């Protein structure tokens, strides 16, 4: 019996050992082996010019994600998955005459990715002659091809293509659709202009066939005031791609009550960043735009640029347009900000804009690329910075690094700032800037530090021709036209060119030569800012013995001077004053020679 028990114990131990060895062997056999990633997409997609939504099947044995490589291809809600599935994307209408191609890419890792091409047909020339008609009570169900079948503004904008015209009846229009690619916050709604169309306001509210636009009689307002006390970050966003000879036209519109965020996040469209903290009225990104007979007024920003922000290589012309009463509560450039773009202004008024930072009026600055600003026959008045620091420069105009700015026939009056109450020019080593004043009047401006009229710093080139800078005040000296050193103290520096000009009481002829026996008194020789003819306000030259009336640059020399600029400034600009009066036979300085 004892032997049986002994052998039983031995047998049991052996069985346990075998079981343990078997389990260990099983663990080895069942060791995890990663799958080789496999991902496959459907074929390339051909899309008509009108765009649309598309679904693409995907085969994958591992988790995947998908991305769009073009801003006109917008992904749907599904951007990832765990295995076999599908995703959708929407293609925007192709509002150009050219075929375009983009890609959608799905990937497991960077090494395991698949792409499909999305090829979209172009619009045809006959598509470009369409006229849309919009009323406040228009319906998205209407075709919008007549006043009697008017549609909504959003419907017309979304369906129009390059070369179309959109006629808008009087009334107030509020955006309801989010900017493409945005997060869809309530404040992301905007009127997006994504094609080179003409958007024309000023028609009667009850317009019928044959109606004529008159913006003064029929205000057409694009307002950022939303329900619930909210405001759109941008009332208008121009995202239209540049096309040969094509430009956006905005005419006869009032753009108001946008409110930018204090958060500097952005969306990228058309190769440009659309910051929600800039451009409460209008933001233009890498587009070609003409703005005529418009008002950009009473927009606000919790950070920068409340009025109009122009960025990323845009080309914008403003004519007969008012930029007024826009306010930055915690930033710079309240009226207009030109960043790495080209801006032209003619017969415009920039009035009553305010910034807590620098520049109440026209701000030109990019940290990395040239910005070009050309202002003709315009008045910049009553703009201000808070002026609490000398660095709060440029009440009306502040041009910074890499900038080139030209003012011709302009009146700069009643502005307030830190240094450079009216105009400031700033540069840095390797980032020089340049400004030229031709036939301008700079008066009645105030600096709480240095340079009541005009201040320029080292690393800048300031050229002054046929211009009156007088009657300005500065708390720390340099009332009128002054260069400052690195300590920002007033100096006797004169600009690179000071020709046929007045600085304070001193009258200059050609080449900085002081005219002996001549003196200028702004109190008796300059009139107040007033309507003296023409579309903008000016200051008259007063008194028969006023040297600025007779010692200015001759007409022939002014015409020749314009040919030296790039681009050239023609005699239709240099040969007339701000009110439109010919300078021929008159050798008078300043913006108004009447």
Model-derived features with residue positions:
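Bacterial Sec-dependent N-terminal signal peptides
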Residues: 14-44, 112-117, 121-128
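Solvent-exposed, low-complexity, repeat-rich "mucin-like" stalks and linkers
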Residues: 25-29, 38-67
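Surface-exposed binding patches on compact interaction domains or structured appendages
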Residues: 38, 59-88
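A short beta-strand micro-motif common to beta-rich folds, especially ectodomain repeats
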Residues: 98-110
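Right-handed parallel beta-helix/beta-solenoid
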Residues: 123-155, 170-174, 528-531
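Extracellular beta-strand-rich solenoid/capping regions of secreted or surface-exposed proteins
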Residues: 154, 159-162, 176-198, 207-251, ...
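Predominantly extracellular beta-rich ligand-binding scaffolds that present long acidic/polar faces
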Residues: 165, 176-196, 208-215, 290, ...
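C-terminal accessory segments
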Residues: 229-237, 494-495, 507, 511-594
